[in-house]
Amino acid sequence: VLIIAVLFLTACQLTTAETYSRGRQKHRARRSTDKNSKWTRECTRSGGACYSHNQCCDDFCSTATSTCV
């Protein structure tokens, strides 16, 4: 009975906190689905122009030719 009461009170607190904070949060936490995520980011394929390694799909930018290798 005590376990059920604790679970019920916890659920009530979570529901209240979610309802109260809805619409008030200015800066939400970043999630793995953001565009800045390496798994979902757009990248330049081999032969395309680049200025840094993180622009290329294979993470290598030739500084001599400014192209992804």
From Swiss-Prot:
Keywords: Disulfide bond, Knottin, Secreted, Signal, Toxin. GO terms for molecular function: ion channel inhibitor activity; toxin activity. It is found in: Secreted. InterPro entries: Conotoxin. Disulfide bonds join 43-57, 50-61, 56-68. Its main location: secreted. The keyword Disulfide bond applies. Residues 18-41 form a propeptide. GO terms for cellular component: extracellular region. Coiled coil: none annotated. Residues 1-17 form the signal peptide. Expressed by the venom duct. Pfam families: Conotoxin (PF02950). Transmembrane segments: none annotated. The presence of a 'disulfide through disulfide knot' structurally defines this protein as a knottin. The cysteine framework is VI/VII (C-C-CC-C-C). This precursor corresponds to allele E1c. Has not been merged with other alleles since they may differ due to geographic variation (see strains in PubMed:19606224). Belongs to the conotoxin O1 superfamily. This is Conotoxin Eb6.22. It comes from Conus ebraeus (Hebrew cone). The lineage of its organism: Eukaryota, Metazoa, Spiralia, Lophotrochozoa, Mollusca. The gene is E1.
